[in-house]
């Protein structure tokens, strides 16, 4: 829903981080801060409560993070608080990771199989995906017994579903249409 705005914030922060050669540091810090917000019930309630003033939220963030993270990253978080966007931090992190991948001509391919791929299967899959997308592939393998067999691949919005589970679903649909 807010992907466009998340991307604008992410690009702005990425440009700052890149100029400082701190992209990985910023992403790691943002993930830790996001985890802290999600896992600390009090902090989460403070941030999500519209009745708590922006000034109070800024004071709380300052007391927690001011001397613990890079000053420019801290300033970015304060801007998010002032613009009432701090609750969108997860989306901003996803977007900054996408920007970083794009700038390194990389793409993530999520691969689901019932059993782990062997080295030759992994290499062949990476080679085919690199040709198709003309980018370096970062393979994220997931073992998923529910697919029964075959391979499921997601690259961005593209899905290649060669699973037995999908074939069964397609046959069910055909049976209901003809039946």
Swiss-Prot record:
Coiled coil: none annotated. Gene3D superfamilies: N-terminal domain of the delta subunit of the F1F0-ATP synthase. It is found in: Cell membrane. It comes from the Bacteria. One of its GO terms (cellular component) is plasma membrane. One of its GO terms (molecular function) is proton-transporting ATP synthase activity, rotational mechanism. Disulfide bonds: none annotated. Keywords: ATP synthesis, Cell membrane, CF(1), Hydrogen ion transport, Ion transport, Membrane, Transport. It is a peripheral membrane protein. InterPro entries: ATP_synth_OSCP/delta_N_sf (IPR026015), ATPase_OSCP/d_CS (IPR020781), ATPase_OSCP/dsu (IPR000711). F-type ATPases have 2 components, F(1) - the catalytic core - and F(0) - the membrane proton channel. F(1) has five subunits: alpha(3), beta(3), gamma(1), delta(1), epsilon(1). F(0) has three main subunits: a(1), b(2) and c(10-14). The alpha and beta chains form an alternating ring which encloses part of the gamma chain. F(1) is attached to F(0) by a central stalk formed by the gamma and epsilon chains, while a peripheral stalk is formed by the delta and b chains. Belongs to the ATPase delta chain family. F(1)F(0) ATP synthase produces ATP from ADP in the presence of a proton or sodium gradient. F-type ATPases consist of two structural domains, F(1) containing the extramembraneous catalytic core and F(0) containing the membrane proton channel, linked together by a central stalk and a peripheral stalk. During catalysis, ATP synthesis in the catalytic domain of F(1) is coupled via a rotary mechanism of the central stalk subunits to proton translocation. This is ATP synthase subunit delta. It comes from Clostridium pasteurianum. The gene is atpH.
């Amino acid at each position: 829903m807010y992907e466009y705005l998340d991307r604008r914030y992410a690009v702005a922060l990425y440009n700052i981080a890149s100029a400082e050669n701190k992209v990985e540091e910023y992403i790691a810090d943002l993930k830790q801060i996001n985890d802290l917000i999600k896992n600390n019930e009090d902090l989460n309630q403070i941030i999500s409560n519209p009745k708590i003033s922006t000034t109070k939220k800024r004071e709380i963030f300052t007391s927690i993070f001011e001397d613990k993270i890079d000053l420019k990253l801290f300033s970015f978080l304060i801007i998010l608080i002032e613009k009432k966007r701090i609750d969108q931090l997860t989306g901003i992190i996803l977007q900054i990771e996408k920007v970083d991948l794009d700038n390194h001509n990389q793409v993530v391919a999520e691969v689901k199989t019932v059993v782990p791929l062997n080295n030759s299967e992994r290499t062949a899959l990476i080679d085919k995906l690199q040709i198709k997308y003309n980018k370096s592939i970062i393979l994220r393998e997931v073992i998923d017994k529910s697919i029964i067999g075959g391979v499921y691949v997601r690259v961005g919005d593209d899905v290649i579903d060669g699973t037995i589970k999908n074939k069964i679903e397609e046959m069910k649909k055909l049976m209901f249409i003809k039946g």
